[in-house]
Every structure is written in C-alpha cells, then in structure tokens.
Amino acid sequence: MNTTPYLEIKEEVYQALKENRPIVALESTIISHGMPYPQNVEVAKNVEETIRERGAVPATIAIIDGKMKVGLSKEELEFMATSKNILKASRMDLPVILAKGFNAATTVAATMIIAELAGIKVFVTGGIGGVHRNAQETFDISADLQELAKTNVAVISAGPKAILDLQLTKEYLETFGVPVIGYQTDELPCFFSRESGINVPYRVETPKEIASIMKTKWDLGLQGGIFIANPIPKEYSLDFEEIDKTIENAIEEAKKRKIKGKELTPFLLSKINELTKGESLKANIELVYNNAQLGAEIAKEFNILS
C-alpha cells in the first residue's frame, strides 16, 4: 500500500510517532461544517491545547490541496475555519478529492482511515454519525458506522448526534461487532443530553480499562474500532425531551426544504442552534472539550500498554 504521496504528517506529530508518545486524532468537519466562525477556530485551538496540557499530542486531520494532513499549522486551521470551498470527505470521497487536489474536512469515517494510515489509535470527536430518523424510508445511514466496524481506531464521543435514531444506531453497531462502551454511565448519552433512556452494553470507570479493552480487541485480531460514549458534563447537559422536540422541528424544516445527504447534518445543527438561542452550540463546545480530556488520558494509558 503506497500512501506516501498522499500523506503529510506535521513535524510535532511525526516526532511523537517516532518516540512512541501518545497522540490523539481530531476531525476537521466540526471546524468547517459544524460551528460558525470564529468559535470554530477558537474551539479547534483550545481542544488541541487541552490535549497537550494532559500530556498527549493533538493531530487535527484534514485534506488540503489533495494531501491528507495529519496535524495542522495555525494558518491551516484558520484556512479550514474560514474558506468557503471546503468539501466534506468520507470514505467514498477520498480517492476523488486526493486525485483532483481538492480541499476537504474529514468526517469521522475519513478521520479514522487517515489516523490508522498514520499509526494513530485514539480519536476524539463531538458526536458520531449514525442511523438517521426515518432511515427505513430514506436509507440514510452514516458511513461512520461501517468505518467503526472495519478500522482499528478507538473513537471517543458524547454519543451519536442527537438528530439520529439512537436505538437503531446502537443496534447497527452491535450487529457489526463494534463494542459500545459507556464511560462512567449506564446510558447511551445523546450528544447534547446525558440521558437517552437507552442502556449501553458495557460501562467502564477508568481510561486504563478502556485502553485494556482496545489492546485485547486488537491482540485477538478482531478488526474494527471501539465506540466510547462519554456524557456531556452535567452542568452543560440540555433537557432530553426539550431538545428532542427542537430536533423534530428542525427535521420538519429540512423536509420542507428538501435538504438531504451531506447537507442535512450541518443544516440541522445550525437550525437547532437557532431554535435553542445558542444553547446547543455552547453544549457542543463543552462536550468536545470534555471528550478531549478523556481522549488524552486513554491515549496515555494505551501507550503504556502497547
């Protein structure tokens, strides 16, 4: 497999790989499609700093001029946050975007692929994609789920995005053999909310336990990732029933406007932020910081074991 012409690893990340230090991968869709400017670039920088403060090296992943970048400079972060010509890349898009020299933010799926190519095993995001509501009619299921089934990277998030069908997303992951693990919780968190009423199959209390599960899974040759659900801190959690009603209203609006596919999630997140008068964006920012802290601790523990 020849990835050299396509992969560009930032010096800080390259040195950490060489010296076998803990590294945490970060996606870029949250920067270009998930939050408005200037919050997006501020959050990206703060997340990287949070990871550094906890003794790991951040590696924000994006595609710039057809190169898979593992670790971004300040200028590149700013470019991803402000440019209007940033595509959204999942697994199916990578060959086209690289071959044509385009710029793209990486989804959970694409970030997992690039992280694994670079040798990074821990990845932090806000929320994963999953089975959309009414997927039995639309067949709208995120490629993130298949990636979790096939790519050896542990993903830390605040649960599936709240706009999804959480029960079906959990069922899908279980069908494809992806361990779904609640960090200090028995319930699958619902992104903006700690509660969902849906139980997780396994609960763990420490980053060390998670690192041990990762090592055991891959020692056994069991292909695929691990999904770690880390609830948003209590003080920032939104009421589950209220946010669910807001989401239903946003989905109705999307249907009226015939918004589908890749455009749907950014539209819904933006509409929900508008309807909650900015509360959902605040929650989104805090849950990402919380996930970054946990991700750094898991990366350090996994580093000791491996």
Curated annotation (Swiss-Prot):
- The active site of this protein is located at 27, 161
Enzyme nomenclature, EC number: 4.2.1.70
Q: InterPro entries, alphabetically?
A: Indigdn_synthA-like, PsuG
Fetch the Pfam families from UniProt. Indigoidine_A
Molecular functions per Gene Ontology: hydrolase activity, acting on glycosyl bonds; metal ion binding; pseudouridylate synthase activity
Report if keyword Glycoprotein is assigned: no
CC annotations in GO: cytoplasm
Which family does the entry's similarity section mention?
Answer: Belongs to the pseudouridine-5'-phosphate glycosidase family.
Q: What is this protein called?
A: Pseudouridine-5'-phosphate glycosidase
Q: Which organism is it from?
A: Petrotoga mobilis (strain DSM 10674 / SJ95)
Which gene underlies this protein?
A: psuG
